[in-house]
UniProtKB/Swiss-Prot annotation:
Binding site for GTP: 23-30, 66-70, 125-128
Protein's name according to its UniProt entry: ADP-ribosylation factor-like protein 2
Claim: Cytoplasm is one of the keywords in the record: no
Lipidation (N-myristoyl glycine): 2
GO molecular function, one term: GTP binding
Pfam families: Arf
Tissues showing expression: Ubiquitously expressed.
SUPFAM superfamilies: P-loop containing nucleoside triphosphate hydrolases
InterPro entries, per database record: Arl2 (IPR045873), ARL2/3 (IPR044612), P-loop_NTPase (IPR027417), Small_GTP-bd (IPR005225), Small_GTPase_ARF/SAR (IPR006689)
Biological processes per GO annotation: establishment of mitotic spindle orientation; establishment or maintenance of neuroblast polarity; microtubule cytoskeleton organization involved in mitosis; neurotransmitter secretion; protein folding; synaptic vesicle endocytosis
Domain of life: Eukaryota
Amino acid sequence: MGFLTVLKKMRQKEREMRILLLGLDNAGKTTILKRFNGEPIDTISPTLGFNIKTLEHNGYTLNMWDVGGQKSLRSYWRNYFESTDGLVWVVDSADRMRLESCGQELQVLLQEERLAGATLLVLCNKQDLPGALSSNEIKEILHLEDITTHHWLVAGVSAVTGEKLLSSMDWLIADIAKRIFTLD
């Protein structure tokens, strides 16, 4: 029995996943996490550091790390990469001015060795706002079709209304589960 098989068996008992939420500041990471956890979203302030939520969903324990996206904090993102099973990249669909920067930051992340193999979910948030770009437009602008190193999905969501948030997170969890809880 190989080392990876032993690790998978240990993780299978725990049914635990580590999910990292990243994106530029004001993209809606904290709002998404609170909405997903069933918490009120009326008082949210910028994340100056990180939030950790542990919650149960579909029979799994999810350790969700919401890390601040301000430019001054991005150099610290690498401190959170270890043992990440899923990466949720949150995009502000209404912030056309920073889409190029958003794409550049994502490309840097995808080259990180410690994130190799992590499932990627790109959430195009704020779909409820007038003028928000569609998930297809963002997929094109961010060149997501070029990603071959990760399983990925792009989804248009609204953290405020909850639109498509649950189905997107369910996809992420199912994809991670197939990868880390299935013994070959």
